[in-house]
Amino acid sequence: MKVKICGVTHPEDAEYAALLGADYIGVIFAEKSKRKTSLSMAKSIADTTKRLGAEPVGVFVEQTTDQIIAICEQTGIKTIQLHSTFPLGALENLLRDYSIIYAISVRENGDVCHPQSLPPKVIPLYDTEKGGTGKQFNWKAFSLPKDTFWMLAGGLNPKNIEEAVATLHPNGVDVATGVEFPNKTRKDPDLLKAFILSAKKSGEKI
């Protein structure tokens, strides 16, 4: 079970998550996000993440291909997360140099908003229509992806991660709000530990 801790805003949070076994540490560059980090902070988080054997992920929403590449070159990030507004035709150019996670929106009722046919190397991440809200979609009504590595996001937290994994059998899980202090962007060490350990343990059962 791969675990991604998203919206990390401080190297200390990245360090603790990586030491606990997180595989991916997400750094957000979306302009409208409360978790957006500066380039210097993102590089510090990325350096810390790589030093501890995890993979930093740059999360982009409205940037162009050239802007994404420029940010990645300045921060040393080699894995990027894109959203459904990013044109599929531009993925192949980025795949030459970067690993890609592609967020696909799911409505509350479990329906995929805009089903996408992605290149084989791209990892689909199924999330609620507005990611980072702490809300989940209807897991039982969701049509499970077949024969592909995929990740789950949307309203996950230490209390429901075991149920989520048992119900949907994802290959990876992604959390932001569910491991944060209330009304803050910093991660809560206790919630981080509970989530990561539970996700890893749950993954061993599927």
Curated annotation (Swiss-Prot):
<dbReference type="InterPro" id="IPR013785">
    <property type="entry name" value="Aldolase_TIM"/>
</dbReference>
<keyword id="KW-0822">Tryptophan biosynthesis</keyword>
<dbReference type="GO" id="GO:0000162">
    <property type="term" value="P:L-tryptophan biosynthetic process"/>
</dbReference>
<keyword id="KW-0057">Aromatic amino acid biosynthesis</keyword>
<dbReference type="InterPro" id="IPR044643">
    <property type="entry name" value="TrpF_fam"/>
</dbReference>
<protein>
    <recommendedName>
        <fullName>N-(5'-phosphoribosyl)anthranilate isomerase</fullName>
        <ecNumber>5.3.1.24</ecNumber>
    </recommendedName>
</protein>
<dbReference type="Pfam" id="PF00697">
    <property type="entry name" value="PRAI"/>
</dbReference>
<keyword id="KW-0413">Isomerase</keyword>
<comment type="similarity">
    <text>Belongs to the TrpF family.</text>
</comment>
<dbReference type="InterPro" id="IPR001240">
    <property type="entry name" value="PRAI_dom"/>
</dbReference>
<keyword id="KW-0028">Amino-acid biosynthesis</keyword>
<dbReference type="GO" id="GO:0004640">
    <property type="term" value="F:phosphoribosylanthranilate isomerase activity"/>
</dbReference>
<comment type="pathway">
    <text>Amino-acid biosynthesis; L-tryptophan biosynthesis; L-tryptophan from chorismate: step 3/5.</text>
</comment>
<dbReference type="InterPro" id="IPR011060">
    <property type="entry name" value="RibuloseP-bd_barrel"/>
</dbReference>
